Regions:
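Glycine-rich flexible loops
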Residues: 1-360
Length: 360
C-alpha cells in the first residue's frame, strides 16, 4: 500500500478502571461505557450507535420493577448525560418478541406507554433490539473496521471467515421491529454467539457488565481490522494509478488560501454561512490524486449511517496543478456547486415523501 500499511487501524482499549469504579449505579456504568465508545469516532459517528443496560428501577408508585435504559433519540454517545437515557418497564417490552410483525407506528406508540419517565427522550427506533438480547448490557456501534467488511459485496462470507461460529450475520433491513426480532432470535438460539453483524449497518455485542460489553467491542473491532489489513495488504488502492501530482506544502497552502473563500461563498449562497474543514491527510490526497477518484467518489455511500452526515454523493472538482490555473479552478468550483445544488433539488423532488423537507 502506498500511503499506510494499515487500511483500517486497530481500536485502543481506553477502559479506565478508576473512573469505572466511581460509576456505582447501573445507569452510571452504561453512561461511562457510552462516553468511551462515542469518544472514538472509529466506533461511532456523531449521533450514531446506542447502548443499553437492564436492571431494576422505581416506578411512579414506588415499586421496584425490571427496567431497561436505552440511549434515547437525539443524543450522542460521547457527550450524553444520564438524562439522555430512556427508562422503560422491561416486562411490558419483552412480550413484543412473540409477535410475528409490528409496524413502526405501533411499536413507537407501545414503547411510549412503557416509559417509566414520560419526560424522558423518545425511545430509539432500536430499543427492541436491545431489549430482545438477553444480556445486562448491550452495545450497538457502527465501527469502521466492521463496516469495511459488512458493506462489502461478499461481506457475509468475509465475516464467517473472520469470526467463524462466533458471529451471526443479519442481512440489511431498516431498523425497527423486524431487525430487532432477527437479532434477538439469533442470540437466543445460540448461547455461544459472541457478536451479531448487521449488513451495511454495524455491530451488536453484549455482556454481563458494561466493561465486558465495551471490551468485547474493542476486541471484535481489532480482530476485524487485522482481517481487513491482511486481505488488503497485496492489493493496490484506487486501481493503483496516479492521475495528478499533489502540490507541495507551500504551494498547497497558497492555493487553499485563494480557493477556500470561493468554495465557502458558493456553498453559503443560500444565506446560511458554512464552516469549511480541509482534510489534507495522506489517505485523502491519495484518493483525490488517483485516476479512479472521479469514478469511485460517485459510487455512493457505503452504508446508510454515512448519509446522516453527508448527501448522497460528493461534488468532484477536477484540477490538474500542472495544466490548470487558479482562475480555472475557481470557476469550476462556482459552476460545480451551482450544478450540484440544482441536481440535488431535482433528486429530492423525485424521491421525497409527502412530509419530507429538504434541510439544505
Amino acid at each position: 500500500m502506498s500511503v499506510d500499511t494499515e487500511l483500517v487501524h486497530p481500536v485502543a482499549d481506553d477502559w479506565d478502571e478508576a473512573a469505572a469504579a466511581e460509576a456505582k449505579s447501573t445507569l452510571q456504568q452504561v453512561l461511562s461505557a457510552s462516553h468511551l465508545l462515542g469518544s472514538n469516532r472509529a466506533l461511532a459517528n456523531f449521533g450514531g450507535g446506542n447502548t443499553s443496560a437492564k436492571g431494576t428501577a422505581t416506578d411512579h408508585v414506588g415499586r421496584e420493577v425490571p427496567a431497561i435504559w436505552v440511549k434515547g433519540s437525539g443524543s450522542d454517545l460521547a457527550t450524553m448525560s444520564d438524562r439522555d437515557f430512556t427508562p422503560l418497564k422491561l416486562e411490558e417490552v419483552l412480550p413484543l418478541f412473540d409477535l410475528a410483525e409490528m409496524s413502526d407506528e405501533d411499536m413507537v406508540a407501545h414503547l411510549a406507554r412503557c416509559q417509566l419517565d414520560p419526560a424522558a427522550p423518545r425511545s430509539s427506533i432500536e430499543t427492541l433490539l436491545h431489549a430482545f438480547v438477553p444480556a445486562a448490557h448491550v452495545h450497538h456501534t457502527h465501527p469502521d473496521a466492521i463496516n469495511a467488511i459488512a458493506c462489502a459485496e461478499n461481506g457475509k462470507a468475509f465475516i464467517a471467515e473472520c469470526f467463524g461460529d462466533d458471529a451471526a450475520w443479519v442481512e440489511y433491513i431498516r431498523p425497527g421491529f423486524a431487525l430487532a426480532k432477527q437479532v434477538g432470535a439469533a442470540v437466543r438460539e445460540n448461547p455461544n454467539l459472541k457478536l451479531v453483524v448487521l449488513a451495511k449497518h454495524g455491530l451488536v455485542v453484549w455482556g454481563d457488565s458494561a466493561r465486558e460489553a465495551y471490551e468485547k467491542t474493542i476486541a471484535v473491532c481489532s480482530q476485524a481490522a487485522e482481517f481487513v489489513n491482511v486481505k488488503a495488504a497485496d492489493r493496490a488502492r484506487f486501481d493503483g494509478a496516479t492521475g495528478t501530482v499533489s502540490l507541495g506544502e507551500a504551494e498547497r497552502g497558497d492555493t487553499l488560501t485563494q480557493v477556500l473563500p470561493v468554495l465557502r461563498g458558493a456553498v453559503s449562497a443560500d444565506g446560511t454561512s458554512k464552516i469549511l474543514i480541509a482534510d489534507l491527510s495522506p489517505a485523502a490526497t491519495e484518493l483525490v490524486d488517483s485516476v479512479a477518484g472521479p469514478t469511485l467518489t460517485q459510487v455512493g455511500a457505503a452504508c446508510p449511517d454515512h448519509l446522516v452526515h453527508t448527501k448522497r454523493l460528493p461534488l468532484w472538482v477536477a484540477f490538474d496543478p500542472g495544466a490548470d490555473d487558479l482562475g480555472t479552478l475557481k470557476q469550476r468550483i462556482r459552476s460545480g456547486v451551482a450544478t450540484y445544488r440544482d441536481d440535488y433539488a431535482q433528486y429530492f423532488a423525485e424521491n421525497a415523501s409527502v412530509n419530507d423537507q429538504m434541510a439544505d
